[in-house]
Amino acid sequence: MADLASRITKPSDEPVDAVAPAPTATTGEGNGTEEPVDDGVNKGLVETTYDVEVKLSGLQADDESLLYSGVASFEELGLAKSINDGLLAMNFKKPSKIQEKALPLMLSNPPRNMIAQSQSGTGKTAAFVLTVLSRVDLTKPTQPQALLLAPSRELARQIQSVIQTIGQFCENLNVEAAIPGSISRETGVRANVVVGTPGTVMDLIRRRQFDVSQLKIMVIDEADNMLDQQGMGDQCVRVKGMLPKDIQTLLFSATFPEKVMIFARKYATNAHEIKLRHTDLTVKGISQMYMDCPDESKKYDILCKLYGLMTIGSSVIFVRTRESASEIQRRMEADGHKVSALHGAHEGQNRDALLDDFRSGRSKVLITTNVLARGIDVSSVSMVINYDIPMKGPGDKEPDMETYLHRIGRTGRFGRVGVSISFVYDRKSYDALSKIADHYGLDLVQLAPDDWDATETKVQEVIKSSRARPDYVPNAGDK
């Protein structure tokens, strides 16, 4: 078992220049840090180089050299003028690394399936949105032709917004969200693009309120969770069985555990595959820290001490259960702190309003369960707190590596510096974080609960830093 102590960097242990070098790309791109590029909706995405592995399926040798090289500009893709106008309006200047490799494959004819692994903030959403917009016949504004599935209503609404933003000049583009309470029983689905959650989509098809006969493309975001048999795998299989057999299937996620990848290859047969090296999966630009709490009861006291730092930007506190989220909200509000809690027990419209308040900055501290761990983009988030270490399996005995990665990916987005702080208090939580650190090769910065001035200084240095360097580690001499 890995020892967490061996993965810890105390703030004063290393010189300021001891920053992990960015991995070198092996797909023909230059080394170093890229200029900021836009991800389609949010500006300022910074991409460090990473190794992109491309596995082509069923192509002739002459085709492989072209598709491996990717594209250097959107103009090379032959997109419709209305789509290009949307890209220009969003100041979307050049493809990101994942877009360079994935878009030529996804847009090729005849359509081919794709399994794409790409970490948060690399432009994966814009990649599949461009493909969807290119497949839709806009002369049929009420005929469903594209289906996108997401694990939560929050992510479905976000994807809907991205499609509408990039497709703002696409005449007759209609995008509906198939989430609980959103589709009228009288009219059913009346849009050419549908974004929804699997359960609602399945119900609409069964009630014959969703005509799937002319669907051309299906996208599953956060596919590792959606296809996991402990998650929504059964629902996704049933939905797929209701769709045309020749539908193009695109699977996207930041992580693909091996057991899920095996199933994904059966779900999206003969698919091209694009993925990052295992060592490139941790999110760049996030300083990952660790707080050894004296006991479980002290976690709350330390959380309250962090409140002043949480409100420099926006912060997300991840807890294990809905009950914990509500209880921490109650206690913090009683202590005079302004916080919100969002979890699955809230009604749909209430959840929408809570997330909208958080996005707009009206609410700056959000307590939540894993419902927000995946895919949600709020660019102002500067801190993520793992109040409870993510666990999985019977009795929560195993650390959940993938959920840890998704959680911390809510900060450090679009070129900004972010901080994640994980609380441990006993042997189980200590060992769990130790295994996560060992799995991703993390050097965690230790924060001292008994030296609050030093802790506060170090966290502030990162949050307020304008350097935005990958893997930034605070140092006593780093001002």
Curated annotation (Swiss-Prot):
Protein name listed in UniProt: ATP-dependent RNA helicase DBP5
UniProtKB keywords: ATP-binding, Cytoplasm, Helicase, Hydrolase, Membrane, mRNA transport, Nuclear pore complex, Nucleotide-binding, Nucleus, Protein transport, RNA-binding, Translocation, Transport
Membrane topology: Peripheral membrane protein
Role according to the record: ATP-dependent RNA helicase associated with the nuclear pore complex and essential for mRNA export from the nucleus. May participate in a terminal step of mRNA export through the removal of proteins that accompany mRNA through the nucleopore complex. May also be involved in early transcription.
GO molecular function: ATP binding; ATP hydrolysis activity; inositol hexakisphosphate binding; RNA binding; RNA helicase activity
Keyword Oxidoreductase: no
Signal sequence annotation: none
Oligomer and partners: Associates with the nuclear pore complex.
Annotated region (Disordered), positions in chain: 1-41
Motif, Q motif: chain positions: 72-100
One Pfam family, short name: DEAD
Gene Ontology process terms (BP): poly(A)+ mRNA export from nucleus; protein transport; translational termination; tRNA export from nucleus
Binding site for ATP: S118, Q119, S120, G121, T122, G123, K124, T125
Keyword Lipid biosynthesis: no
Gene expressing this chain: DBP5
Main location: cytoplasm
Catalysed conversion reaction: ATP + H2O = ADP + phosphate + H(+)
PROSITE patterns on file: DEAD_ATP_HELICASE, HELICASE_ATP_BIND_1, HELICASE_CTER, Q_MOTIF
Organism: Chaetomium globosum (strain ATCC 6205 / CBS 148.51 / DSM 1962 / NBRC 6347 / NRRL 1970)
Domain Helicase C-terminal: 285-463
SUPFAM superfamilies the record matches: P-loop containing nucleoside triphosphate hydrolases
One of the record's GO cellular component terms: nuclear pore cytoplasmic filaments
Main EC class the enzyme belongs to: hydrolase
